[in-house]
């Protein structure tokens, strides 16, 4: 099988989901390519789209709440969204790519490429089988205007949510959000601490704002610093992502008991080494944490799909959600002290999240391609 994974740099979760499927495809002996489709037209265009998104997340996240509300209103209107029409300009680019690089299936963990493929289909251009992977625990605006052969959704109990928005029930596959195999490794908290060079007698709180360093990390750290300074057994680990300004600011503070990192390729290990993970509720990062079985405290949700992610996780007992930073020390202390509460959270994660999502998605892709070949016989 020859697969193409199309993603976009607007949020690390989409790319991470795509890379998880890419990794699994390679393991299964398939040919697979992953790319950002906009780079085929212009690297400047691709970079501009990515930078605009990242800058908005870091500086004016509330703008996403406004856009999300507009999207939910717009989706009720009897015509297609601006996103659909903007992506029409990519049809010729992708048609040329397929002529030069034929593939059996296109897998898309991002809405924009799905809009491109839908445009091509509606213009009578022959395209491969298509699969969309939802990376949030909600049907995000305009997903319903795409026309893919299969839609992978995070969980079975979200089926009615997607059907209600217009996705055909027979196209829905509740296989979960795919995660990198590193999150599936089974090492104890003590083993991970030793591998990372951390103190085995300390309790670590891991704080991130997602791959782009969004969220009120500074305020969160300020609230938790006094708490951790009063507790000799507690230390903070902060991962800033690509937010260089935040990283430099925290480095200059050089606060005791606080370890500051930029990017890390050992996120799974840091999660398993931690007693608590504080993060904004991105769909992919939350799923990764649940796969690792680490207690989660969601905060600083970007209004819109992240609010829905937080509600889903809290509603299923997989996390605690709190946006008031002055309440964080009390909640953190409760989680660290109450081992039963932490254990219950991890049990709920284990019962709700499909760890084998990447493998299941690859099996579905194989099935779709096999059916396509059978139909052509």
Predicted regions and their residues:
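Active-site and donor-binding regions of nucleotide-sugar-utilizing enzymes
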Residues: 12, 17, 73-166, 171-174
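Conserved N-terminal ligand/cofactor-binding loop architecture of enzyme catalytic domains
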Residues: 20-95
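A nucleotide-sugar donor-handling region in carbohydrate enzymes
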Residues: 149-211
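Conserved donor-nucleotide binding/catalytic region of nucleotide-linked donor-dependent transferases
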Residues: 188, 320, 325-326, 333-350, ...
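Donor-nucleotide binding loops and adjacent catalytic segments primarily
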Residues: 191, 198-273
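Acidic donor-binding loop of glycosyltransferase active sites
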Residues: 272-282
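Short hydrophobic beta-strand element within catalytic cores of glycosyltransferases
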Residues: 277-279, 295-304
């Amino acid at each position: 099988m020859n697969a193409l994974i199309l993603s976009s740099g607007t949020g690390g979760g989409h790319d991470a989901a795509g890379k998880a499927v890419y990794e699994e495809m390679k393991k299964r002996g398939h040919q697979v390519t992953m790319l950002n489709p906009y780079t085929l037209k212009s690297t400047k265009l691709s970079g501009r789209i990515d930078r605009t998104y990242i800058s908005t997340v870091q500086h004016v996240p509330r703008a996403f709440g406004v856009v999300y509300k507009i999207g939910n209103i717009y989706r009720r209107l009897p015509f297609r969204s601006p996103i659909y029409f903007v992506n029409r300009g990519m049809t010729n680019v992708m048609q040329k790519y397929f002529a030069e690089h034929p593939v059996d299936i296109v897998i898309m963990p991002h809405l924009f490429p799905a809009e491109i493929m839908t445009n091509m289909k509606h213009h009578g251009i022959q395209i491969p089988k298509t699969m969309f992977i939802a990376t949030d625990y909600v049907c995000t605006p305009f997903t319903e205007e795409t026309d893919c052969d299969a839609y992978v959704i995070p969980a079975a109990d979200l089926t009615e949510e997607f059907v209600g928005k217009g996705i055909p029930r027979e196209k829905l596959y509740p296989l979960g959000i795919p995660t990198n195999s590193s999150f599936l490794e089974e090492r104890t908290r003590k083993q991970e601490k030793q591998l990372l060079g951390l103190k085995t007698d300390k309790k670590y709180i891991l704080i991130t704002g997602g791959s782009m360093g969004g969220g009120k990390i500074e305020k969160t750290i300020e609230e938790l610093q006094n708490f951790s300074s009063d507790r000799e057994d507690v230390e903070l680990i902060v991962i800033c992502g690509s937010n260089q300004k935040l990283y430099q600011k925290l480095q200059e503070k050089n606060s005791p008991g606080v370890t500051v990192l930029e990017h890390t390729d050992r996120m799974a290990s840091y999660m398993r080494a931690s007693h608590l993970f504080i993060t904004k509720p991105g769909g992919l990062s939350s799923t990764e944490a649940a796969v690792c079985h680490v207690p989660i405290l969601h905060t600083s949700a970007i209004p819109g799909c992240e609010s829905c992610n937080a509600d889903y996780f809290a509603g299923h007992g997989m996390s605690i959600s709190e946006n008031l930073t002055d309440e964080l020390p009390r909640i953190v202390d409760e989680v660290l002290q109450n081992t039963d509460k932490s254990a219950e959270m991890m049990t709920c994660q284990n019962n709700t999240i499909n760890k084998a999502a990447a493998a299941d998605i690859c099996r579905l892709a194989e099935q779709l391609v096999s059916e396509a070949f059978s139909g052509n016989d």
